[in-house]
Amino acid sequence: MKSMSILLQNDTILHIGIDDTDSPKGMCTTFLSYKIVKFLERQEIEFVDFPSLIRFNPNIPWRTRGNGAVRLTIRTKNPKKIKNKITQFVTSYSDTKNGANPGLVFFQNKQIPVSFNKFSKLALCKLISRKHAKQFVSENNIESFYLGNGQGLVGAIGAIGYKFFDHTFELLCYRKKSQFGKKRRISKSSVKNMQSTTFPETFSSYDKESDRVLITPHGPDPVFYGIRGETIKSVVRASTLVNSDEKLDGYMIFKSNQGTGDHLNNELQVDELKPFNSGFLIGEVCNKPVIERGGHVFFSIKVKDRKIRCAVYKPTKITNVAQNLILGDKI
């Protein structure tokens, strides 16, 4: 028992944050994380939690797709070896030739400092500069690595600092390298059946109105499909109902804030409205909604004696609600 106690005392909790390893032309930070996890499974480590996929502010203009960063948390006796190997993975797999600016952050401690939590909360709803991220790393003496301009440090820091108050799960299936960039062939009828069988335990799989499969991306990235759901059991079950002839490399389940509306829990200050911020305002409709070219609806609300112009764009599918607003409605 004494030897076991010594071993436990020598263990280190290592938090790993990764972001911006992909580009519109390829790669995916979750796929890189999948490769890292496959490596870690062969090491003498223990996973403390599920891999976490944190989707930050969706209004960031230079996001590749879902503005997601990844956190891995492990217990290890050899953090130096692990960190060196993960740095090699990020260097080798990141699509820097097509504009990726990867960031990698390591933090060794069981407890995450409040400063990380505050940074993460800002990243959910605001635009954080690279300068701010690099300053945070320097002031807190954080071990980090980046390529390009270091934009990925923002998500990497934020991923480590993120606190789950609600979560869903996302099962991501990955293609073999020989299939990257090729058309994804998946049975639409099987996805329709999967949704009707597993909803509401799974969500955002198929759009009935447009008769469109939602689980498959459209770019050349390594993801074949992703299923989102409320439980591990539900996403695994759903994946068994999806039919395709393509032989896949494997899959990984992430704990995620996808579908929780986390970035909308921020009440915006009417005197501090800025482009790209996410959040909500509460006000009263003060002019009649107008439908403009393209079917988009525009109106204004009054918030603390300030008039704020609002737009509801047609792709949101709530323009019918918006155009029926009347003066005095509180929204």
Task: Give short role names for the model-derived ranges.
Residues 86-268:
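Long, hydrophobic alpha/beta structural blocks
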Residues 18, 72-78:
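Short beta-strand-to-loop capping motifs
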Residues 11-55:
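N-terminal ordered "arm"
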Residues 275-294:
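Structural detector for short beta-strands of small beta-barrel domains
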Residues 290-315:
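OB-fold (S1/OB) nucleic-acid-binding surfaces
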Residues 25, 78-85:
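Short, conserved charged micro-motifs
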Residues 316-331:
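Short nucleic-acid-contacting surface segments enriched for D/E, G, S/T with interspersed K/R
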Residues 51-70:
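Short, charge-patterned binding micro-sites
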